[in-house]
Amino acid sequence: METITQTARVFYTAQTHTIGGREHGVSRSSDGHLDIKLSTPGTAGEGTNPEQLFAAGWSACFEGALGIVAGKKHVKLPEATAIDAEVDLAADRNGFFLQARLNISIPGLDRVLAQELVDEAQNTCPYSKAIKGNVNVQYNLV
């Protein structure tokens, strides 16, 4: 197993334990805050799936990044700021892959300024940086 060289300060490490994968699986966090059932999309299963979890985590992280970028510009994000994330599980002849869209609403903010915040947040959000060049993404200011 390859080790990770720590070159930066780690702020937080999430730990989960998953059994069963996306078909009838369960996943729990070490702190007990997350305890979920997993199911394959389109089946009668009662659980969530990795795509929904990614969409929730990414949209929350991106909104946090928007707040950081806005703060640096001395701009207050409206309370009604919201993000609708869509993450597709797709396949082609090379296998499975993800593609995604973030639909970002920043009501009441000048559209040019809002777009600047969205553009800068893409380079701030750890999720966006992690998938850049690996996942086809559309960032839509709505």
Regions found by a protein language model. Name each.
Residues 1-56, 63-142:
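Extended beta-strand/beta-hairpin segments
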